[in-house]
Amino acid sequence: MGFTDETVRFNLNDGDKDEISNTLTNVYRSLAEKGYNPINQIVGYVLSGDPAYVPRYNDARNQIRKYERDEIVEELVRYYLKGNGTDL
């Protein structure tokens, strides 16, 4: 399978955006409560796909695994750009 010069569209359902945001908040809190650095752990999970970066505490691991990592990245980028004044 090769790459193409054509731009591919990627779309995330609007309902999933809120659910992903809520999940990330819950996972962040669970990581913090267990004494981990939540940002480092979430980045580790997103980059590697290894669920061991997220504890089972408060069902955080199962919650974050409901979503594909590219969906999580899309929500993070959207949130960042919106928070920095980009009109989305």
UniProtKB/Swiss-Prot annotation:
It holds the Pfam family IreB. InterPro entries: IreB (IPR009309). Belongs to the UPF0297 family. NCBIfam families: PRK05473.1. PANTHER family: UPF0297 PROTEIN YRZL. This is UPF0297 protein stu1959. It comes from Streptococcus thermophilus (strain ATCC BAA-250 / LMG 18311).
